[in-house]
Each structure stands twice: as C-alpha cells, then as structure tokens.
C-alpha cells in the first residue's frame, strides 16, 4: 500500500501539470536574459513622462523601475518609476495575463528594472500619487531586465518624506549618513533627481550667459607647485620625487590667461580645500564656477558683470525649472528666492553699521562670522526684501595677498563678496597686476616667492587691470532651493569625515 507522502505527490503532479496548462500567459512574463548587446532591436521605448492622454489606447513599451507593487485579488497594481516621473500599471487576470503572471508581477522586488508592454488607458479619477495622473498602463507583457536584491538599505518613500510629517505622524525618515552611505539609492528619489537637474541647469546657464557676454571657457591645472591661496589648507600629493598640491582655486591661472590677452575667461571645475570644517556649508572638494575679466577703469565693471550673470541664472532657473523647484519644496518647504535688478550693493562699513545697530560688537577690520552673516542676511531681507546682495570694500587684512588695496583707504581693499540668503557664495576682487606691489604683498603674507615665480613673472610684460571671483556651485544650489546642508547638493560629497562612496 502506498505511503501518505507518496499519495500526496501523486496528487500534486497532475495539479502542477494542470496549473502549467492553465498558464496561457507564460511567454508574456519572466526574467530576461542579461543584455550583453547580443542583438539590436527596433523596439521603441516610450518615456514615462510622455504617457499622457494623447497616447490613450496606444500600445507602448516602457522600461522603468518597480517603485511599488500591491496585489489585490486577481490583479496587481504597480507604480513604475523613471527618474522623477512615475505611472500606475495594472496587471489583471484576463486575455493577456494569467493568475501566475499577476503573482509574478506582485512579487518583483522593488527597484528592479522591467520592460513592460501595455495599453495606455485614460482614468476616470486622477491618480494623485503619480506624476502621470490622467492615465494608467494596462500591462500585456512584463519582463525583468535587472532584478534588485529583496532588501533595500533604505526605502525611497521614507527618503522623500518631509521631516515634519515624519515627526508628526511617527513615520520613518532617513538620516543624512544613511543617505550618503547608500547614495546611489538616495539619488533615485524625486527630490535628488530634481536637485541635481537644477544644479546642471546652473552650470548650463552660467556657461550660456558668459559665452553670450564674450567670455572664453578655459581649463586650468589642478596639480600645482604652490598653494594657490598662499595658505596652509592644501592637500599635498606625491609628484614623482617632489611634493605638489591640489589647487585651492584656479585663481593664478585665470589671471595668467588675462595677461595672455584672453580678456574674459571662465572655468568650471573641482576645487580642493584641506579645511577641517565639519559645518553645513563646507566641503573639502567642491565645484568652482570661476570668472576673470579685464576692465577699463574700475573693478565695478567686473563686479556688475558677475552680478548680472547671477541674476540671469536666477531668472533662468525660475523660468525653466519650476517643476524641479516644486518637487524639492514638497519635501523641504521654502520661500521663493528673491533678487533685485540691479543687485543691491552695500559697502562693508554699512553692513557693520547694521550689525552694530542690532547689538553685534565688531571691529572695523574683523571678518564676518557665519552667525553674523546669517543675521545680516535677515536684516537685509527685512529692509530691502532681497535674498541676493553684494558687500563691497572688505578690509584688506582679511583678503588674499593678490587683492588690490583701496588707494583711498589703505585698510580697505577693492574686493567684494556676494551672498544668497545670508551666506557667502562668491568671493572676488580686483587683482594686483603690478609685479612690484604683488611681490610686496606676497612677502607680507609670508609666501615663498620662488614657488609663485611663474605667477609674478606673468605680470612683468604688461598686464591689464582685471578682477574676478569664484562661486561655489553646491552652495548656490543649496541656497537657491533653501536647503540646509551642502551635502544635499553634492552628488558624492567629500568632507573631513567622508571619503566614500
């Protein structure tokens, strides 16, 4: 007599055969073989952002990530995400989908990449949880192109939840270190996608504006023989049998290009600062947007050109990136960025007077601390209703050796900083273009003349008066969007405690 287990097996076998026979959709779903460029295909993949009412009733192919999946009886709802856009997809038992296909779709791991064929259908009620609110995709085929591991280091829904909402409702949010440790996942969120698309827009607008103004884009060396700012905060690297340094700025080379008659130059590239500053706004490596320009009679010609460039960037961002701004504001609410035309300019002594009136004790030659910068930003916003302004005529004592002194006041300099929401985003000045005065100032700052000989020599053969400035890309992005930490606007941030990923 057969055992109970043998009897069960004999009963299961016909059921398996029957189930396989019932799976009439088995060719319509599954795990695809790895794409190794085996063959080319004429299949057209439609972008999720293009799934609109205009495509209603069309059959389309889409490649996207599985953001969420939810099984409900004989159907499964998926949210398919592609960058910052997403659409609801429905897999339901019917002519094109078997119950096995529905079960397969419901069990695809989050963040897996899938190819889906489906019919675009107009919905009667807007799908508020998706960017594509007027349509959904009725799935006919679904294949996994790249399977994600079942356990994610962070949940994307948690990563985009406003902190206030998480605190009020007791729901999970994701802390900064977890985000940065798993940066590739964090960068997939709609907020991160919006931040870095807007940041790309800043670079594009900077380049576009300056080229239209007649500037030439240059590239400068990042491995240099002497500290470009003359300070100690440099990274030393081994350079064959000598030591070299990572450039703190392209300053000296921008000026050399002006001496070489390029007249107006700019560059976009990495800047390195070996400062042990663990603050919300400091990085050891960031992207510098640098400008240098010859002028005719007064350095304000350059200062005003830079200010206008910033205004053109702000205008361009507000015109072209409203969707991204609104996406970031959902998670990090913020007042819209305000600026004036022409840009507000105050002299440093006027800023000191405002701070002293507010109870701050400062000497005439003291530099602004971060708290005082922020306070000044609030005072200026209250008085002038602008988030962007210039402080001019800084004390000479707090500026680099190559800064031109003010001929009318030896304690002041022809230098300026630009601010957004009470934080400095640009430092600039007229440069010393006379080799004798430059030598004197370098010695005053204790700089080894031998290490900057090529720089000083470049002024010995005739140099036009010139000025410029350097902007921190990550800070501009952070402050325009009203974010609170520069690590949110650095794709893979470097600070004194972080060297990976």
Curated annotation (Swiss-Prot):
Q: What is its main location?
A: cytoplasm
Q: Where is this region: Aspartate?
A: 251-254
Q: Which Gene3D superfamilies match?
A: Bira Bifunctional Protein, Domain 2 (3.30.930.10), Nucleic acid-binding proteins (2.40.50.140)
* Matches recorded under InterPro entries: Aa-tRNA-synt_II, aa-tRNA-synth_II, aa-tRNA-synth_II/BPL/LPL, Asp-tRNA_synthase_2, Asp/Asn-tRNA-synth_IIb, NA-bd_OB-fold, NA-bd_OB_tRNA
| UniProt-annotated location(s) | Cytoplasm
The upper taxonomy is:
Eukaryota, Metazoa, Chordata, Craniata, Vertebrata
Taxonomy, superkingdom: Eukaryota
Q: What class of enzyme is it?
A: ligase
Locate the residues binding ATP.
273-275, 281-283, 424, 472-475
| Complexes and interactors | Homodimer. Part of a multisubunit complex that groups tRNA ligases for Arg (RARS1), Asp (DARS1), Gln (QARS1), Ile (IARS1), Leu (LARS1), Lys (KARS1), Met (MARS1) the bifunctional ligase for Glu and Pro (EPRS1) and the auxiliary subunits AIMP1/p43, AIMP2/p38 and EEF1E1/p18.
Catalytic activity as recorded in UniProt: tRNA(Asp) + L-aspartate + ATP = L-aspartyl-tRNA(Asp) + AMP + diphosphate
Give GO terms for biological process.
aspartyl-tRNA aminoacylation
UniProt function note? Catalyzes the specific attachment of an amino acid to its cognate tRNA in a 2 step reaction: the amino acid (AA) is first activated by ATP to form AA-AMP and then transferred to the acceptor end of the tRNA.
Carrying N6-acetyllysine, the residues are 74, 374
Give the gene symbol.
DARS1
Q: What is this protein called?
A: Aspartate--tRNA ligase, cytoplasmic
């Amino acid at each position: 007599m057969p055992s109970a287990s043998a009897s069960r097996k004999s009963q299961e076998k016909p059921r398996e055969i029957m189930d396989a026979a019932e799976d009439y959709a088995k060719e319509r779903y599954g795990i695809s073989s790895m794409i190794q460029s085996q063959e080319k295909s004429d299949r057209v993949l439609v972008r999720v952002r293009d799934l609109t009412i205009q495509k209603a009733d069309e059959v389309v192919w889409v490649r996207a990530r599985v953001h969420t999946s939810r099984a409900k009886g004989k159907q499964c709802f998926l949210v398919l995400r592609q960058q910052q856009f997403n659409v609801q997809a429905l897999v339901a038992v019917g002519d094109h989908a078997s119950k096995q296909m529905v079960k397969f779709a419901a069990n695809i791991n989050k963040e897996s990449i899938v190819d889906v064929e489906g019919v675009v259908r107009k919905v009667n009620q807007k799908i508020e949880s998706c960017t594509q609110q007027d349509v959904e995709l009725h799935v006919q085929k679904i294949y996994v192109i790249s399977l994600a591991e079942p356990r994610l280091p962070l949940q994307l829904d948690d990563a985009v939840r406003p902190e206030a909402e998480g605190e009020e409702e007791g729901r999970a949010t994701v802390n900064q270190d977890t985000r940065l440790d798993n940066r590739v996942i964090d960068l997939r969120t709609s907020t991160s996608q919006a931040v870095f698309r807007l940041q790309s827009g800043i670079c594009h607008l900077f380049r576009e504006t300056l080229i239209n103004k007649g500037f030439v884009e240059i590239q400068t060396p990042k491995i240099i023989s002497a500290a470009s700012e003359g300070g100690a905060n440099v990274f030393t690297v081994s350079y064959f049998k000598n030591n070299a340094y990572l450039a703190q700025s392209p300053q000296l080379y921008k000026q050399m290009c002006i001496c070489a008659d390029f007249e107006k130059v700019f560059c976009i590239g990495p800047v390195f600062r070996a400062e042990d500053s663990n603050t919300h706004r400091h990085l050891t490596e960031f992207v510098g947007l640098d400008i240098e320009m010859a002028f005719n009679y007064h350095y304000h010609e350059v200062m005003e050109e830079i200010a206008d460039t910033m205004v053109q960037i702000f205008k361009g961002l507000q015109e072209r990136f409203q969707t991204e701004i609104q996406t970031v504001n959902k998670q990090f609410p913020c007042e819209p960025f305000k600026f004036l035309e022409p840009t507000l300019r105050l002299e440093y002594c006027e800023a000191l007077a405002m701070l002293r009136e507010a109870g701050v004790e400062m000497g005439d030659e003291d530099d602004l601390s971060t708290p005082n910068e922020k306070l000044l930003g609030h005072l200026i916003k209250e008085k002038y209703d602008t988030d962007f302004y210039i402080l001019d005529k800084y004390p000479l004592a707090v500026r680099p050796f190559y800064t031109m002194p003010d001929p009318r006041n030896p304690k002041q300099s022809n230098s300026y900083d630009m601010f957004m929401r009470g934080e400095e985003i640009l430092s600039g000045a007229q440069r010393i273009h006379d080799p004798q005065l430059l030598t004197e100032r370098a010695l005053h700052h204790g700089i080894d003349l031998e290490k900057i000989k090529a720089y000083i020599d470049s002024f010995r053969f005739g140099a036009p008066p010139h000025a410029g400035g350097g902007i921190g890309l990550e800070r501009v992005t952070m402050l325009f969007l009203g974010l609170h930490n520069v690590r949110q606007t650095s794709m893979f941030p470097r600070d004194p405690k972080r060297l990976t990923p």
